Amino acid sequence: MKRALSFIAAAALSFAAAAQEPAVKVLAAGSLRAALGDVARAFEASAPGRRVELGFGASGLLKDRLAAGERADVFASANMEHPQALADAGKAAPPQAFASNRLCALGAAGFQATPQTLVERLLDPAVRVGTSTPKADPAGDYAFAMFERIEQAGHPGARQRLADKALQLTGGPNSPPPPKDRSVYGALMAAGQADVFITYCTNVVVAQREEPTLRRIEVPEAVNVAARYGVTLLHGAGEPARQFLQFLLSPAGQMVLARHGFAAP
């Protein structure tokens, strides 16, 4: 009897200790908000007592915060360069690719374009083109890389013309904070801030769910840009953080990402 009671007491103490463990703090690209929320819930369900605390923002700005000393356990970026910079600075482990994305055009209800006419419409001086902020947000970097590809595809001067006219509406250090629990892209387009916005295809899906009148236009393969997402463990992260990273990279975690439109890295 005493042995049984001792076993029960030990099990209870073990469970209580697990329940009191600090949450795994994850800082992640804003484009991962819905997907990583589901990954975190699936991880918590698979590991009783484990908790995940999520924070989202533009990957470049998150990288700067971590470089300046903010504490986190896991950093999930919309590119490989930002987590690699933290690794190079001795603050994190080498990053691992865990997902990929592509660019799409999110058009206002009245914006007329097809994949075949999209480039010409973007180059139209009357069309307002929205992007995220380069350097601060990889989505902006990818959009500007797309402008370069448009020029290389036979449109001399297109890169500079598009860069000059691009409205950098989100993702920058001075950008208005995104609305809580709503797609910033859907909100910007609903407010008439641009005629078309170049962003990730996964963001377009979320924006259209909230604003069904918005249009999705596929970016032609010849000028599209692949986005490769990287994740790293920050130095000082404990075993729960390692387990979360392993779950994210596992078939179970990858299945959740795929449901949200992310492809394999």
Residue ranges: model-predicted function:
Residues 10-19:
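Hydrophobic h-region of N-terminal signal peptides that target proteins for export
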Residues 1-2, 15, 56:
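Intrinsically disordered, low-complexity proline-rich regions
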Residues 20-47, 51-60, 64-68, 77-80, ...:
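Exported/periplasmic ABC-transporter solute-binding proteins
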